[in-house]
Amino acid sequence: MKHTDIITKLNLEQKCALLSGDTVFTTRGYKNAGVPSITLSDGPNGVRKQAGAADHLGLNPSVPATCFPTAATVACSWDPALGEEIGRAMGEEAAAQEVAVLLGPGLNTKRSPLCGRNFEYFSEDPYLSGKMAAAYVRGIQSEGISACPKHFAVNSQELRRMASDSVVDERTLRELYLTGFEIVVKEAHPKALMSSYNLINGIYANENAHLLQDILREEWGFDGAVVTDWGGSNDHALGVKNGSTLEMPAPGGDAVRELLAAVRSGKITEADVDDRLDELLTLVLDTHAAVERHSRSFDADAHHALARRAAGESVVLLKNDDALLPLAEGTRVAVIGDFAETPRYQGAGSSAVNSIKVDTFLDCLSDSGLHSVGFAPGFDRQGKPDAAKQAEAVALAAKADAVLLCLGLDEIKESEGLDRADMKLADNQIELLQAVREANPNTVVIVNAGASLETPWLAHCKALVYGALGGQAGAGAMLDVLNGKLNPGGKLAETWANAYADTPARDHFAGPGRTVQYREGLYVGYRYYQTAGVPVAFPFGHGLSYTQFAYSDLHADAHSATLTVTNTGDRAGAEIVQLYVAKPNAEIFRPAQELKAFAKVQLAAGESKTVTLTLDDKAFRYRNTRTDSWEVEGGTYELRVGASSADIRLTAAVEVIGTDALNPYAGKALPHYQSGKVQTVPDAEWETLLGRPIPDDRVKIDRNMTLGELNHGRSPLGWLVWAVLTALLNASYKKGKPDLNVLFQYNMPLRALAKMTNGAISMGMVDGIVMEVQGFWVIGLVRVIFEAVKNVILNAQLENRLRNS
């Protein structure tokens, strides 16, 4: 241990107390023992340190900070160097605000387009996610503070996120959902990592020994602190035993007593507590020293400029018929769409930043070189039909050379705590597009959304530009692209399917009950569409430019590929060169191809550059569940180099030496996984891949019953709580603004009452509530009252002892 000198000064109760938070965003400290308290804070695309009363959902005001583009946006830049710059700026702002741990980045795999929090995550591909997240972590930690990558792991939905069980086969777990985290841990060495809310194969992530000990700490060598998601601890003692360091936010005295009792009963040992405390002290002492050294200032203007550059480099040009873009200087434009006036530039929830400033499309238009003939909102933001607004917009469109039509998803469509209902734009926006296009065929659609959309309306626009959620400076960056000041170089980090019905997890997202079956296995995103031969609207890695690029002279072996890329157009631009690995006629089933390297290349008009793409130890491996290790199938592989997953320009065959492991699927009937057509995998085949029966999906009346499931109980009071929460949710939907507090409560298990109330409610009181919900009303009420009195007395005694020590 590194900190024996401090640990030996503390008694067991003090040590146990340090392993849970003091307030919503601070740890406990003991000045006499030389242990300072530190502050943790959201978020993944900017610092969200709350100024007054703290809450984990971003409901109360926070200190102004730079709002950078979200991870889903910056992933489209395919530029780790840019990600590192953003991370460095966020780390600087965090340290200036005395934040020691910045809770991000998020790198959950985008299993489904409907996950309401996809705007916070990088990609459907673990390699791209891992490389981008590692860059953010390096940048943040260059300032001496800690990043905290999240949510570890298999956390791909918001519905019942604190109580759902992600049922996934081991190979898919390792190859798809953990590889991004593996890259981050091994390449960027984060000082902290956040465990996810959910269970993984029946065991909560925060107490999952296979996840935290076997893989994270032993196999990957992680020696930092594992922090729970806020309220995400189920069994605090098991978490400590199996590798979880710090329970947040502030569970109060009950958490301390739980650990004390666990040590005394032999459930865990004092050595377990000491190991976790040693990890925590390393985090606390290192980051506290960095915060103390900081000047408490940063260059807000420079960070705004960086935010604008990041947004611009992440813009994806999806369609550009007749080379409508870029627009020449002086072009008369009609600006239409509510988002031009009130931009959607970030997501809702714990990542929401109180931006220092926010550029709007209308504000930046005067400096763009374009001539505005006027602005019309065109549609109601929450989707209500408005014929007058549409008529005004159509009349304005007829007066212009081109229309800049700003469309997108509103605040209720994508948010923490809420999954999307569909992949569609609102009907009133589509109707407006059709009407505007009739008035002016030179219609440019600008989309602001944190995830992919269905585009049946694509024929009604001449150009389509995806700005995602561009942060506080995204509007100016978009105009830089539209007027040609910046040549778009972004490419999609997720596939845009033609329809939700085409997506691989359509029948199992987000699960009808507590169990969420990851039945599609390895076939997520482009891995599915290309293997199963499903057409898409826009493939993974797609993005157009105002210039053209030629690929030539590919030379490759099992370690690297070298080629020449030439800008054959008349203006400078950036090309993202992508390398996919394929094994035709493989014995071990696998996706048709997988991204294994990429590089972003800046080229002047007419310039050629040699590009070398290096293949690492993950290029040819697969997880063999029979040998429980990484293996390589030997033989001939194809290295496919191209401008997108569907636009392969050059290929090379390479011979790879295998490990000669036995086929883990020998003798097993897995036809859907062999073909990749996994939308309709039958139960028997899924159980064969899983290696066990499909778990029971019934709601149980226990500590992990969510408030949104109380209608399954036997208590009138429980039914009343459920009815009130449901009514409040429906009211917020009608207003068009998510009520994050109600959403959190709706998906919150009963045990979280003891984890989120700073000790006001104990787990004993929760057990009394469970008894009431089970129908034992009188006995349950008596227990709640008894445990409440007991909790007040014990908390007062504990706090008195801790203060005096």
Regions inferred by a protein language model and the residue ranges of each:
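Terminal connector regions
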Residues: 617-664
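Charged, amphipathic alpha-helical linkers/stalks
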Residues: 652-724
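Long, compositionally biased, glycine/small-hydrophobic-enriched stretches that function as flexible linkers
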Residues: 693-805
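Intrinsically disordered regions, especially transient/low-confidence alpha-helical propensity segments
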Residues: 75, 227, 493, 627, ...
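Glycoside hydrolase catalytic-domain context in secreted enzymes
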Residues: 1-622, 636-641, 645, 758-760, ...
